[in-house]
Amino acid sequence: MTKSVAIIGAGITGLSSAYFLKQQDPNIDVTIFEASNRPGGKIQSYRKDGYMIELGPESYLGRKTIMTELAKDIGLEQDIVTNTTGQSYIFAKNKLYPIPGGSIMGIPTDIKPFVTTKLISPLGKLRAGFDLLKKPTQMQDGDISVGAFFRARLGNEVLENLIEPLMGGIYGTDIDKLSLMSTFPNFKEKEEAFGSLIKGMKDEKNKRLKQRQLYPGAPKGQFKQFKHGLSSFIEALEQDVKNKGVTIRYNTSVDDIITSQKQYKIVYNDQLEEVYDGVLVTTPHQVFLNWFGQDPAFDYFKTMDSTTVATVVLAFDEKDIENTHDGTGFVIARTSDTDITACTWTSKKWPFTTPEGKVLIRAYVGKPGDTVVDDHTDNELVSIVRRDLSQMMTFKGDPEFTIVNRLPKSMPQYHVGHIQQIRQIQAHIKQTYPRLRVTGASFEAVGLPDCITQGKVAAEEVIAEL
C-alpha cells in the first residue's frame, strides 16, 4: 500500500524534504501545504531593468557542498556562479579598516597582517597572543556564549572589532548571549585539539590551501549563486519534485495537525481534512506553535527571541556615487553609531547582477533588541541607510530606485543552552510523534545548505519509520 507524507511549508527546507523523500521512495505520495502564493520562503529574487536583486538571502557557502550537489542534480550546474573575491572591511572607530589578511572569521592566522593592522591597538594585539598560552576555556553545562569564549581566548578588543562584526551579524544575536556550541562548535573543537584557537585555525587554513591546490583552476570565492538568482534554484527544485508527482498546494493554511497512533490528520483552509502516514513540518516556530503549543515540550519556543531585519537595496548610476574603497563590502562593529549592520557592494561582489555603468548596494538594518525596522517607513529606512553609508562613501545624486524588504522576526536567536534544548525536543518528537519531524531555522539551520541538510535528514528519518 502506498504511503503518504504531508510537508508543511514550501521553503527551501520543505522542497528539499520532498526531493529526498522521492529519492528514497519514488512511489511515496507527497503533498506540500504552503500558506503563501509562491515557493521559497525568505528566498526571493527580483529582476528589474537588467538588475538581478536578492531581497532575502544573497548566496550560500560553497564549502557546504550539499546545495551545489542538489543544484547539479536538478540541472543547474551551468548556472552556478562564484563571487568575485576582493577586500572586505570592518567599520569601527568611524573608519573602514581592511580585515587583516589570513584571518578566518576574524581569528588571526598570519602574524604580519595582524601585527600591522591599525584596527587593533598594540595592547590588543599583545592580549590576543595570550591565546597561545592559555588552557582550554571551561564551559558550564556544555555551552558558553560566543562573546565569553572569544573574550577569554583573544581579548575584548579583538572580540569587539573583529569577531563580533563578522559573527554577530550572521545570527542577528548579541554575541554575549549567542550559543557557541549551537553556531560555531568547530572553534571549540580546534581549541581543544591544538590548545590554542590561533594554532587550530592556522591548521584549518592550511587544510583549505591544500584543498585549493587540488583544484588549481577553481574559483577562489567562498560563496555561490546562480546567474538567474536564488529563486531560479527554488523554481527548478519545485519543478523537479512536481515532475516526480509531488502535489504543492499554495494559498493553503494549515489550521491543525491532529495526531493518532497510526496516522496524522491535517486540517486546512477552515476545517477541510486529509489523513497522512507521516508529516514534515518546516515552518518558523511562530507558526508551528499553533499546532504544538499545548505540548509543554515545545515551551522553549514560546520564549525564543527572533530579530526583525530589513534589506535595503539602492541602485545608482556610477557617476552619482564615489567609493574610494576597492572591495566587496563591510560589516560594522557594534560600538559604532549606525543603524545598519553591514553592506555589500553587490555590483563588485556579483558583477552579473548589475548593468554596465550602474552600481548596486545592499545594506542590512536591524540589531537584536532594537525596533528601528518596525518604527520607520520604507522611505525613512532608505534615508537612514543613506545617512549611515555617507560615512563610508560619497553620494553625488539620488538612487535610480530603492527597494526595502522587511523580514519580521526572521532570525531566531540561539542563546546559550539552545543546542541542549533542541536535542531534548527532538528526542521528545521522535518518541511522542512517530513518523513526524519538525525542522528548520528555529532548530539549527541558518545557512541555505544547512536547511537542505535538515530536510534530507528529516526525510530519511520519516521514511525509515513508515
Curated annotation (Swiss-Prot):
Annotated Gene Ontology cellular component terms: cytoplasm
Cofactor info, note text: Binds 1 FAD per subunit.
Record localization: Cytoplasm
The keyword Oxidoreductase is assigned to this record: yes
Superkingdom of origin organism: Bacteria
Pathway membership: Porphyrin-containing compound metabolism; protoheme biosynthesis
Gene3D superfamilies documented for this protein: FAD/NAD(P)-binding domain, protoporphyrinogen ix oxidase, domain 3, Protoporphyrinogen oxidase, mitochondrial, domain 2
Molecular-function GO terms, alphabetical: oxidoreductase activity; oxygen-dependent protoporphyrinogen oxidase activity
InterPro entries membership: Amino_oxidase, FAD/NAD-bd_sf, Protoporphyrinogen_oxidase, Zeta_carotene_desat/Oxidored
Catalytic activity: coproporphyrinogen III + 3 O2 = coproporphyrin III + 3 H2O2
Biological process per Gene Ontology, one example term: heme biosynthetic process
Protein name in the entry: Coproporphyrinogen III oxidase
Species for this entry: Staphylococcus aureus (strain NCTC 8325 / PS 47)
